[in-house]
Amino acid sequence: MKGKKYYSDYHVWIEPIHSRIVKLGLSSQMREHLGNILHIDLPSLGAFIKEGEKLCILESSKSAIEVLSPVSGEVLEVNTALEDDILPVNNATESEGWFVVLQLTEDFRSESFSLEP
């Protein structure tokens, strides 16, 4: 499971790190649809994010959207480098452009997600 990426209906990729720890980011397919990302508003360290609720806000050349979380958990790590340099979201969406690392409320269930965006 570690190293694989899974994709949600919310256009967010999920990379399991441990059974209850995952890294989240925007699918490259959605990034292409949005156009050039200009700004991101990320959650705070320690915040609790619920499945289906706001994970972050992205402002692009086309629109501003709320990105919804595909899972529930506490924010363990935030990619704060994106606040100073948004380029990784545009150029390395599914690697250096990750948003947060979450500690899930329950074990990650890969069968709920797709292996393709």
Swiss-Prot record:
Family to which this protein belongs: Belongs to the GcvH family.
What does the entry comment about cofactor binding? Binds 1 lipoyl cofactor covalently.
Q: Which NCBIfam families match?
A: not_gcvH (TIGR03077)
Q: What UniProt keywords are attached to this protein's entry?
A: Lipoyl
The gene behind this protein is: gcsH
> Which biological process terms from the Gene Ontology are attached to this UniProt entry?
glycine decarboxylation via glycine cleavage system
| Lineage summary | Bacteria, Pseudomonadati, Chlamydiota, Chlamydiia, Chlamydiales
Q: Looking at the UniProt record for this protein, which Gene Ontology cellular component terms does it annotate, in alphabetical order?
A: cytosol; glycine cleavage complex
InterPro entries the UniProt entry points to: 2-oxoA_DH_lipoyl-BS, Biotin_lipoyl, GCV_H, GCV_H/Fam206, GcvH_Chlamydia, Single_hybrid_motif
The record's CDD domains line, in alphabetical order, gives:
GCS_H
Keyword Iron included in the entry's annotation: no
* Name of the protein described by the UniProt record: Glycine cleavage system H-like protein
Which residues does the record list as N6-lipoyllysine (modified residue)?
A: 62
The coenzyme or cofactor needed here is: (R)-lipoate
**Organism the protein comes from:** Chlamydia trachomatis serovar D (strain ATCC VR-885 / DSM 19411 / UW-3/Cx)
Q: List the disulfide bonds.
A: none
